[in-house]
């Protein structure tokens, strides 16, 4: 598998379609820096599947597209193609039979890449699979870029292992292992889902089994809870009695102490008022004195500041006067010096003017002499140079014509040989084209494509339908589980409510049950079960009816009256007759019957009972009632003519009507949920059956589609290869015909050029001999004129220097005179200004003396007055401090009394509140005892003295939690249990199948691991041996080796040890850049020696090497080229010498790279002719 050519278009700087042929095993790429040589390496890496823009020296994948230049627009897409010669059949699998393999990658501005294999669109994975085990890849050891040769040897042990694995061909095994692990992961996920389903199913089965046992505990726990609650009430009542006695004694003591503290507080307030009045008077007197003190202080401060400021100003004026007098004396001295200096400068300037005029006349004469000599020299030089130029031109023309004749002779020989080769190729291609049948391949591809498209369409339709069925199944299961959970919860609630309601309706009374059983009325409805009460009036109805809620509903009372008279009295037995006629309307306002709906004759029980919204309205309406009538409120308060009844329903019937309404609602909800579950179960079952059918058909269709895809890929590859060969051969025939015609024209043109060159050579040789004699004569004349011109130029230069010196001196004198005059004028002005300033200073000193004495006298008087006032203020402050101390002491005593009163008042309030709270709680407990029909004293008498409420409370809570933990009871669990058990058996079969599949996959993993271990060990040992042999060869000595970081061959990293001759370094990182590069080269060549990749790309690997190492490196590359094809980029001439074929990358147009190729062997052969 050999790389034939590289085609680039629009990739980075290669904007034009460019082909780089690779005819030999040593191809060098040369060119200046920045011309695009490394873009060739990037192109190869990119087309082989590189997906990281960073490894291509870019930020995004679109950066590889030519981005435009000063003269070019940006390209719309980039394309790179590699063409391989696979005549050796090294490409594995289905590609082994192709003589030529072409892979191409192109990318547009949107960053999406497309891959093509022999002209057929494919995936990136297909490209990487093609190179698995060959040593090639986007980041393989066969591509070594700038700077990476050293990083290769410094790679981490894990990264170095990947290189050894690629050399061992393990990558394809690892890919298979990865795919097997994915299948194992999917299998484990399915097992986990099955385990979750089985676990959930197991929980449901256990739940159904447990529900039957829960009902047995309910009654026993309820009775025990009632007993403990009654005893707990007794404990609380006894504790409240003791608390009330204690609070009453504490409250009496606190009230006595409160009266005593109130008297103390009043005495403190009276004393505090007298002290505050005295403190106010003292404070006012001190404020007046302090105000006067501040006024005196301010005036004294002002006078003191004024005196200091005046004294400072006078001192500054004296200093200023002395400084001005000194300045005036200096100005007068400087003025006299400048007058003398100005007279001397003017005299010297007049003398220089005479000398300068004489020298300027001499300079004019010297310039004339020099110009005449220069003109003669120029004329002579131009004549001699013209003759010399003509002679050299004629000699160059003669040499050019000789070279041209030699090239024309060689070119003629080449054209003759080329004609013979082209005629032979033309004959061979015509025969091959006649034998190639492309149409048969096209018909085969069309047939497979049509069948595959039909199969793919069927697969997609089946997949869509299967997904729809999965959604349907998932949706049904998602709805079924909550529905089942809701059904179980409601069924449990129904069972609990039925148990409670059975007790409330008296169905568990044994004596009455025997009578009803004898009368065949055990299953008859009870009054509380047949009536419906308007919301809010349940308490009122329960209060009025009481035990009559347990009445048995019968069609007629007549058959049972005689039996009742003869029967033994039961604990309670009531009968109620169904309504036989219409209900009479009431006349005294809303009746309780108006809030009840029932098919029963309730007029006898509820006649004359009216309704009111609250007790006040009931009392108002009771005034107009008849003796047998009464009014009841929603809360159960009942009032009649001359009587009032305030009671709650008895504990057995409390909430029975609301519970009955809730029970009817729950039964209706159970029916709805059961219907919903049946519908959802049917939908889920239908979806599962349909999904299994669709998945089976989909697998068969996908299998057929895969087979057709493989066949289509093979057929397309064969068609593409045939079409490519046909197109290539036809194109080559056209090229050959065109080249033969061009050869005939070139041979005619070559003969004409040869005759022209011979004639031009003879003419140039004759003219050159004639001009040689004339040029010698002109040379002597030119030398004599040069000497005369040099003498005139030196004389002129000397005079010019003297004139410049005199002019410079004159200019300097004029400048000095002007400066001195200006300075003298400034000194005169400064003298007058300084004298005026001195007079003003003397006058100001005289004027400031008198005010200073007056202010000093006034300052002494004010200071004495402030001292007297300060002593008086100190006495007043001491008096005020004594009064404030007394105020603070009395205020502290009052505050202490207030705090004690506040705390005591709050304590008394809390004790009263606690007493009231305890009293209310005791009354509440006594009411609860009354409702339960027990006396507190009797219950407490049966309790031990050390009984603690917390223990009884914990027992009640424990029993409540046990009852709560029982949850609802499900009476329909058997059928569901059988259904779920059958489903569990099906899931267990699925689990066994998946477990067996997982075991098979694990065996496959073990087999792959064994193969990988064996291959890795063998490859590591061979590469290590080759590395140990290559290293001394490159370094001229030393030693190197590869070492494993651990014993596990599946995970062990690989480290590199290298010691050049004479060194004992402990780490590879201590080597120089050149030594690292040579060590990495030795390792790469050892890998290539074991498993040579089809080609190797080296990008300036020799850059860090010196000349001796470059020589050894080049010789080793040349030896390795017998097995491996090398494409190297270099700037080193020694490396270029080993190349069989040179490709030069140029950038004549800014930003655009082009390739110029040279066959070195052909060039050497041509040069030797």
Curated annotation (Swiss-Prot):
Main location per the UniProt record: cytoplasm
Domain SMC hinge: 525-620
GO biological process: chromosome condensation; chromosome segregation; DNA replication; sister chromatid cohesion
Similarity field: Belongs to the SMC family.
PANTHER family per the UniProt record, alphabetical: STRUCTURAL MAINTENANCE OF CHROMOSOMES PROTEIN 3
Record's function text: Required for chromosome condensation and partitioning.
The protein's name in its UniProt record: Chromosome partition protein Smc
Originating species: Methylococcus capsulatus (strain ATCC 33009 / NCIMB 11132 / Bath)
Taxonomic lineage: Bacteria, Pseudomonadati, Pseudomonadota, Gammaproteobacteria, Methylococcales
